[in-house]
Every structure is written in C-alpha cells, then in structure tokens.
C-alpha cells in the first residue's frame, strides 16, 4: 500500500465476466469504490472489448470507459486479458467453446496480471471478482489477498445456486429418474418457489452437467470469499439476505446505478440512441418502453404477438430491437408494422435505457426481467410487464410479480399467446 497525504490508498483488482449484464454493474461499482478513495484496476477480456469496439460503442483503445470518472480525479485503470480464444472468434455463435475457454483458460491470464500488479505502486491488496468466475478464492489465497465475491443478480438467485445440493438431494434437479414438480420449500430464506421459477438452466437436461460443473465450482469458490457483495436492496430481499448472512458475510450494496457527481461508465455494447427529443413531445405516462436486453433472443411468433398487442393498444412506444435479438429472418417484426405505427412509436437498435425510464412520458416497461433492468425500472418508478426469456429471468419475474407486486405477467418465452398479449396491452 502507498501513503498519499497521510491517507492509505487501497488498490483493488476488479475482474468482471464478459457479458453486458455483469459488466455494467461491475463498472459502476468500480466507480463507487474509486469515488471513496480506492485505486481500481478493472479487468475484462480482449474478446469482450473487441465486440464492443467492433460495434462502435467504444474505440479500440477503450480509454473512454472510465473517462468521466478519471476527469473527476478518480484513479481507475483498465486492463485486458485473453480468454484463450482469438479476438475475432464468434463467442455468440460458438457458446460451448467460449464457455470451455472462459472456465478453463482465463485463470492463467488473470494470474499473470496479478503477479505484475503485485509489483505495481501501490500493489493490489484486494481481489474483487464476479461470482461466476471459478478461480478467485484459489488465486486470492495463493497471493495472500482478501477476496470479495461480487454478485450481480438477485439474492434469491444466489440462494438457489448456493443451495443447489438441496435441489439434488430432494429430487428437484439432477434426478436420474423423474424430477419433482411440487413447490420447493426447503431453501433457507425462501418460503416457497415453484420449479418453473428456477433459473432456466435447471430446466435443460443437456445443460445439467454444465450447471453442476461450472456454476457449482464457482459457488464453491464463493464459499471461500471474505465478503459477498450483492447488487440488491436490503429492504427488497430481507428474508433471503438474512438467511445468507447465517452462511457468509453477505451484504446488499445496490441498486448500483451512477449517482450524481460520480460520472457513469461507458458500458454499452452498442452505440446508444438519444430518444429524449421524441419523448418530450409525448404526454406524461403515455409511452410503453420495450426492451429484451443484451442477450435474449425472441422467436418470430412471440415477436409477432407482442407487436400485434402493441399495435392494438394504441399506446405510444419505444421498442429496442438490437441486432440479433429476434429470429434469423430479415425483419423481426410483422410486415406493415412500422407503417401502421407511424407517428406514435420508435423502433431503435439500442438506447440510453435509464434516461428513457426516467422520462415522465414513460408509463410502463415491457421487460425480459434482466436484473439490471428491474433495478433501473424500480429506481425510476416505472411498473413492469414481465416477459422472462432465459437464465435468472424466470426467478426475477417471481420477485417482481408475486413478491414485490410491482409488475404483471405477459408470459414467458414460447408462451405468449394472442389473447394473453393483446389482452394485457389494453389493461
């Protein structure tokens, strides 16, 4: 550690994982640490950076990611490491190969960087890592550093993964015969949850072994953490947080959104369109915002039914349809949709989501239930229409609709039906 004007400066190595939903809260939390006097070296992969640069979201050098924070005097440094694959490798098309490289090859490159930064001035003195990395506790112990596990999802989802052995023991997951379908009532801090509300990976037989191997290993590492920091709010998940605190030093540190005077990180995968001028021309609470996040893919049938619901509702709307978010067909929307909605809607490839949600013209959010989107929607006071697609989104839907009661169901992937979608659009 170094001493600057009598103040001890801690140097945190912060390693995220290469997905938008993890990168964004990690980058914004890094800024919060730096605003409180930490030196932060923020690490992501060369492949993820190349993806962002190729889309035009950042320049090749990537210096603007923390440009605002650095202009305010914060000491945030950026480092890139290899995930073991060429930067031009299509990680979206070849998910299994990417997953294998991420879980098996990334560690050696992070370890090499750690050796270098232990000789820096000041040297790193704490490791912060996304919980889904499978090596942080091991490396932290190797170099004598405290390890902080950073969880970007809901505490409820953490509890499910943390207690996956209970699902196996009770026959709700990984059963060699028939998997139980009744309510799960034995996870500490979770009074009851239906199997259909579990993370989507638990419903995919071919993914079962990957869940047990990779996520299981990651959570074994998390059990070796000195602290677990979760991007949630104590008051929203008090019961499950209390139960987790009986197991680990577990703290809610959310919602992690940029505060005034901190500066935000440039975290988008794509250039962001400013919709504010169009929103200014709309009456209060008259606009439905629609976005299915940075990864989810929606079938042509579901896109069509949602589009018909939007068309029949007569509401104003902003619909984010990023490249690759729909089916492989040239146009993800029904023929004639754009013309029929002319004058009351915008279809954009990407936008500044929090800016849109904060605008008084926006009265609702049709969301895939990604955790960052849910937190932003709550932060901005916008009710949600829930359409979970994959991963933790079905579990998040349960929180929003059943526990917190700040949203309603549209359906889930493959379940959108004409009456349901068109009925909700006019509710």
What is each residue range found by the language model?
Residues 1-427:
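Glycosyltransferase specificity loop/lid
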């Amino acid at each position: 550690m170094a001493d600057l004007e009598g103040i001890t400066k801690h140097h945190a190595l912060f390693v995220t994982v290469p997905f938008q939903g993890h990168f964004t809260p990690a980058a914004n939390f890094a800024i919060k640490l730096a605003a409180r006097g930490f030196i932060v070296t923020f690490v992501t992969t060369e492949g993820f950076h190349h993806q962002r640069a190729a889309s035009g979201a950042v320049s090749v050098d990537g210096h603007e990611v923390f440009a605002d924070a650095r202009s305010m005097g914060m000491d945030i440094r950026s480092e890139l490491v290899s995930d073991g694959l060429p930067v031009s490798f299509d990680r979206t098309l070849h998910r299994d190969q990417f997953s294998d490289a991420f879980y098996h090859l990334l560690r050696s490159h992070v370890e090499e960087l750690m050796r270098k930064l232990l000789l820096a001035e000041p040297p790193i003195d704490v490791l912060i890592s996304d919980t889904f990395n499978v090596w942080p506790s091991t490396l932290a112990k190797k170099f004598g550093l405290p390890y902080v596990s950073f969880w970007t999802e809901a505490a409820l989802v953490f509890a499910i993964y943390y207690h996956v052995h209970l699902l196996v023991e009770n026959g709700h997951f990984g059963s060699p015969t028939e998997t139980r379908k009744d309510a799960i009532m034995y996870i500490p801090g979770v009074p009851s949850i239906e199997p259909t509300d579990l993370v989507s990976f638990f419903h995919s037989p071919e993914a079962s072994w990957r869940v047990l191997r990779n996520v299981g290993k990651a959570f074994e590492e998390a059990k070796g953490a000195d602290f677990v920091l979760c991007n949630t709010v104590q008051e929203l998940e008090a019961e499950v947080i209390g139960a987790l605190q009986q197991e680990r030093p577990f703290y809610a540190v959310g919602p992690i959104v940029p505060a005034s005077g901190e500066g935000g990180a440039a975290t988008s995968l794509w250039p962001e369109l400013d919709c504010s001028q169009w929103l200014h021309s709309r009456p209060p609470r008259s606009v439905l915002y629609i976005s299915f996040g940075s990864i989810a893919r929606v079938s042509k049938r579901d896109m069509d039914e949602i589009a018909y619901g939007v068309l029949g509702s007569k509401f104003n709307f902003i619909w984010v349809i990023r490249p690759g978010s729909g089916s492989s067909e040239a146009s993800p929307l029904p023929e004639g949709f754009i013309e029929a909605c002319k004058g009351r809607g915008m279809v954009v490839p990407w936008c500044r989501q929090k800016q849109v949600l904060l605008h008084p013209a926006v009265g609702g959010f049709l969301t895939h239930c990604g955790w960052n989107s849910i937190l932003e929607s709550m932060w901005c006071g916008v009710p949600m229409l829930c359409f979970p697609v994959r991963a933790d989104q079905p579990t998040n839907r349960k929180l929003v609709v059943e526990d917190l009661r700040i949203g309603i169901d549209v359906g889930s992937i493959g379940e959108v039906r004409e009456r349901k979608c068109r009925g909700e659009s006019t509710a």
